[in-house]
Amino acid sequence: MSTGNFDLNELKRRMQGATQALKHELGGLRTGRASASMVEPVQVEAYGSHMPLNQLATVSVPEPRLLSVQVWDRTMVKAVEKAIVDSNLGLSPATEGQVIRLRIPELNQERRKELVKVAHKYAEAARVAVRHVRRDGLDTVKKLEKNHEISEDDQERLATDIQKATDSVISEIDQLLAAKEKEILTV
């Protein structure tokens, strides 16, 4: 029972990369509920360069529909406020000293449906990435068997293991999508 030059754990790690990317993409979808990840893409013109917001301020969620941005340097408050407005996130900042409050507006039903469609696109892209990894793994196993580095039985066993890993990751992707869809549609 030799596996030749095939590493199933490496294949699983590559598949998990697709779910990690999906988690990151889904985290960026605005759901009507405040999340610090909503302002992650905001770049602030500071100290002569563009910097991520999280390098200039602490972002917290004091209420389900409110973000609080505590700017560390008083001179950067206006720049942070401008960056938030320019980011097209649909958030309007209210500044009190060094604290910028961002109220998250209600999502209408039409916008919620659009967000669900976007979430489905992200999930499908992740599924496709996992299937590509599966295909690469199966191709590698077939080549190993063709070159007589592994037996035909080992090839079949590895192909079954690859399919089990694929099914597991696809199931995880479906669970992530279902959870995000529920979060988006919950009023």
Curated annotation (Swiss-Prot):
Entry-linked Pfam families: RRF
Gene Ontology molecular function, alphabetical: ribosomal large subunit binding
Keyword terms: Cytoplasm, Protein biosynthesis
Compartment(s): Cytoplasm
Annotated GO biological process: cytoplasmic translational termination
Keyword Zinc: no
Ranges that cross the membrane: none
NCBIfam families noted in UniProt: frr
Job description of the protein: Responsible for the release of ribosomes from messenger RNA at the termination of protein biosynthesis. May increase the efficiency of translation by recycling ribosomes from one round of translation to another.
Protein name in UniProt: Ribosome-recycling factor
Gene name, Swiss-Prot/TrEMBL: frr
